[in-house]
């Protein structure tokens, strides 16, 4: 009876993912195969001058792959999934729920169109949650009057949009996504009302897009809000004063929608920028938001989302609160992380951007180890913990406190005070960015901040509801994909090589399993060198007559074949289980290689350069838009090149090298030495088959997205140079 009572009290349940017995059997046999491969390499080293250097290089690469494989198993051993009971939350707390401050970050009105940003803003304003308890803050690091204008338009449209969402309980509550998904369908409301709201939205979007195209705001619009007076002709995105404007004051009697319900508070912030001070990128913006929001609303829960990551599930706040307010476990939980999902994925995931295996397999495994990663968007934090509070068994959060009382200050006075919290000099000689708030000094400020929270004793929870909580825009070109993964791999590798290395910083603070889990991503960049070696040297060995694998009829070929086949089949199983298609998995294998020889390689090089003081940290925004032709090719699942990027030269060189070497290898097999070189021919052939779209882009396609002739010529030159390598 006691157990039943306890179970009834719980606001969430934790369930183990099934199929572990089969997985562990597979892992054990693969581990045995890997040990046999390493033993073979160690005991069959050729004499000097007989391909010894190439053999030792292969052994080193395989040793690295073995170590990395062991690390990746840490998140597959015992994954869990979470289930919440929102009905119990409603029964227990009714309207006595904590306030929530929502942070949305943008930086460039051209890379991140304001019309996209405000759809995200409107979606988080429309949560199935008391509006008076929601405060939404937009950080505009570009300090653009265009973004402010778009937010002002959104504040007007919200008066009609929020009642519409509540009245018909629609999903999603991003107007752009809703009208795109429900085109021509309006079963929940009358066609007249549906068309009316849709027309209002489209007219607003056209006004915003027109202003962005012209770069100007109509003078009559500027007269409608005092905030437009903050801008002058001398301001730039890198040099401007702090701006804080409250567009909707949730405490004002006038802040109501068309149904008379209270509107959420809506605030625009552009922190001060000056060439004399480092602004610390997104981390600096988030810390400024923490301070400004503490003055205006000071809610105990903070949600941060990227500007393109709209709310797709209006119950996400309530799901997160099931963890924060659970009587038995809430005192341990520092943040609740939702997965990243995208609404612009092609059917077969042409660029491997779906993150399905990471979302459905790896993050669940990290959750079981005591903490999934903080990934910088779709994450609910407890304010005090984000601000540096250490874990204590006796600590109890005061969830009952409401939105901060204002006293006798009017909104203009609040705005002026808030500006002083968003200056360049406020953080000087303070612990902001170190012990307080989001951490500085790393391109992936989110991961290192989450690691610090875990090392202070807090756990985190990974919540994957049936309806995706947040949906965003994935890179739609190869260049954007490479850039995004270069930034991720560089940032995580920077952490690995810093004092925050999880094995050092996390020793005695977090479990070994979680330390290894962090290293899966921390070592992405380090995977580049052994991968490049493995996709080039065996191919060159075919041309130069250097065998690098056991003969195909030898018993020692068995562990090589077994490890390769079982690992490949299990990766296919994970991909299909996570929602990928067979072709999507195959595309993922291609992108696995492409990212390792480009994104991860550049991330590795740039990290080493920074450590040597040869370069400084930078942050490049992944564009959220692409032109019409690029978008069409993306929908047709055609790889996008189109420029003479050095990364494309690497891709073309590897593809062309393996093609030429395969032809040479086949001639050797026809000459009667198939038993010796067949393993290398098979490896080379698989790389060639994987790269068929690359050959098409080099020699067949005529569209603007093909590989340019200079890239093809450069790759031919590098292939010729590769044949001069003495290593084999």
From Swiss-Prot:
Top-level taxon in the UniProt lineage: Eukaryota
Primary localisation category: Golgi
One cellular component (GO) term of this entry: plasma membrane
GO biological process terms on file: cell wall organization; cellulose biosynthetic process; plant-type primary cell wall biogenesis
EC number assigned by the record: 2.4.1.-
Pfam assignment, any one: Cellulose_synt
Membrane topology: Multi-pass membrane protein
Active site: 141, 446
Keywords: Cell wall biogenesis/degradation, Glycosyltransferase, Golgi apparatus, Membrane, Transferase, Transmembrane, Transmembrane helix
Cross-referenced InterPro entries: Cellulose_synth, Nucleotide-diphossugar_trans
GO MF: cellulose synthase (UDP-forming) activity; cellulose synthase activity
Subcellular location: Golgi apparatus membrane
Enzyme class at the top of the EC tree: transferase
Keyword S-adenosyl-L-methionine annotated: no
Transmembrane segments: 21-43, 53-73, 523-543, 546-566, 646-666, 669-689, 707-727
Sequence similarity: Belongs to the glycosyltransferase 2 family. Plant cellulose synthase-like E subfamily.
PANTHER family the record matches: X-BOX TRANSCRIPTION FACTOR-RELATED
Free-text function comment from the UniProt entry: Thought to be a Golgi-localized beta-glycan synthase that polymerize the backbones of noncellulosic polysaccharides (hemicelluloses) of plant cell wall.
Name this protein carries in UniProt: Cellulose synthase-like protein E6
Species assigned in the record: Oryza sativa subsp. japonica (Rice)
């Amino acid at each position: 009876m006691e157990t039943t009572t306890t179970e009834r009290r719980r606001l969430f349940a934790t369930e183990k993912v099934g199929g572990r017995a089969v997985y562990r059997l597979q892992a054990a046999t693969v581990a045995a195969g890997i040990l046999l491969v390493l033993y073979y390499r160690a005991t069959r080293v050729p004499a000097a001058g007989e391909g010894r250097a190439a053999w030792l290089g292969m052994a080193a690469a395989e040793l690295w792959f073995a170590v990395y494989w062991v690390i990746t198993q840490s998140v597959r051993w015992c994954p869990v999934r979470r289930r919440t009971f929102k009905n119990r939350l409603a029964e227990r707390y009714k309207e006595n729920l904590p306030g929530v401050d929502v942070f949305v970050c943008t930086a460039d009105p051209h890379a991140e169109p304001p019309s996209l940003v405000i759809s995200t803003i409107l979606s988080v304003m429309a949560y199935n949650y008391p509006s008076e308890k929601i405060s939404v803050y937009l950080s505009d690091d570009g300090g653009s009057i265009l973004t402010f204008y778009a937010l002002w338009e959104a504040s007007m449209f919200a008066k009609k949009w929020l009642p519409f969402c509540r009245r018909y309980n629609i999903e999603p509550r991003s107007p752009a996504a809703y009208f795109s998904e429900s085109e021509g369908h309006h079963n929940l409301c009358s066609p007249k009302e549906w068309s009316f709201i849709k027309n209002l939205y489209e007219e607003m979007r056209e006004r915003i897009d027109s202003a962005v195209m012209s770069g100007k705001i109509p003078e009559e619009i500027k007269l409608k809000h005092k905030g437009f007076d903050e801008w002058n002709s001398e301001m730039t995105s890198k040099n401007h004063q702090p701006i804080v404007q409250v567009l909707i004051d949730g405490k004002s009697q006038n802040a109501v929608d068309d149904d008379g319900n209270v509107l959420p508070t809506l605030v625009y912030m552009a922190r001060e920028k000056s060439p004399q001070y480092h602004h610390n990128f997104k981390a600096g913006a988030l810390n400024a938001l923490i301070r400004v929001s503490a003055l205006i609303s000071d809610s105990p829960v903070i949600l941060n989302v990227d500007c393109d990551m709209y709310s797709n599930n209006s119950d996400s706040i309530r799901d997160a609160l099931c963890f924060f307010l659970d009587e038995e476990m809430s005192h341990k939980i520092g943040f609740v992380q939702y997965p990243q999902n995208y609404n612009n994925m092609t059917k077969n995931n042409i660029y491997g951007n779906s993150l399905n295996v990471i979302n459905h397999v790896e993050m669940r495994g990290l959750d079981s180890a005591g903490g999934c990663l903080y990934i910088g968007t779709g994450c609910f934090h407890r304010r005090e913990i984000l601000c540096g509070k250490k874990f204590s068994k006796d600590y109890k959060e005061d969830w009952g406190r409401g939105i901060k009382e204002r006293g006798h200050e009017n909104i203009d006075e609040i705005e002026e005070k808030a500006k002083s919290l968003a200056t360049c000099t406020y953080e000087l000689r303070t612990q902001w960015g170190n012990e307080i708030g989001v951490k500085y000094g790393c391109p992936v400020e989110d991961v290192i901040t989450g690691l610090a929270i875990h090392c202070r004793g807090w756990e985190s929870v990974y919540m994957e509801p049936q309806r995706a909580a947040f949906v965003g825009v994935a890179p739609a070109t190869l260049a954007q994909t490479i850039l995004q993964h270069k930034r991720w791999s560089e940032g995580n590798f920077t952490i690995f090589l810093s004092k925050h290395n999880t094995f050092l910083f996390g020793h005695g603070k977090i479990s070994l399993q979680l330390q290894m889990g962090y290293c899966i991503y921390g070592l992405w960049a380090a995977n580049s060198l052994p991968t490049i070696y493995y996709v080039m040297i065996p191919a060159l060995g075919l041309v130069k007559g250097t065998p690098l694998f056991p003969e195909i009829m030898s018993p020692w070929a068995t562990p090589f074949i077994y490890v390769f086949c079982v690992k490949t089949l299990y990766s296919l199983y994970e991909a299909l289980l996570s929602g990928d298609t067979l072709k999507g998995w195959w595309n993922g294998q291609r992108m696995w290689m492409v990212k390792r020889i480009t994104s991860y390689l550049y991330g590795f090089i740039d990290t080493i350069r920074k450590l040597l003081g040869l370069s400084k940290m930078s942050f490049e925004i992944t564009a959220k838009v692409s032109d019409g032709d690029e978008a069409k090719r993306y929908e047709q699942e055609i790889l996008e090149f189109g420029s003479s990027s050095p990364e494309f030269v690497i891709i073309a060189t590897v593809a062309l090298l393996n093609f030429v070497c395969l032809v040479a290898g086949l001639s050797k097999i026809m000459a009667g030495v198939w038993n010796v070189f067949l393993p290398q021919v098979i490896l080379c052939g698989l790389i060639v088959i994987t790269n068929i779209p690359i050959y098409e882009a080099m020699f067949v396609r005529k569209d603007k997205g093909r590989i340019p002739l200079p890239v093809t010529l450069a790759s031919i030159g590098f292939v010729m140079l590769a044949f001069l390598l003495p290593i084999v």
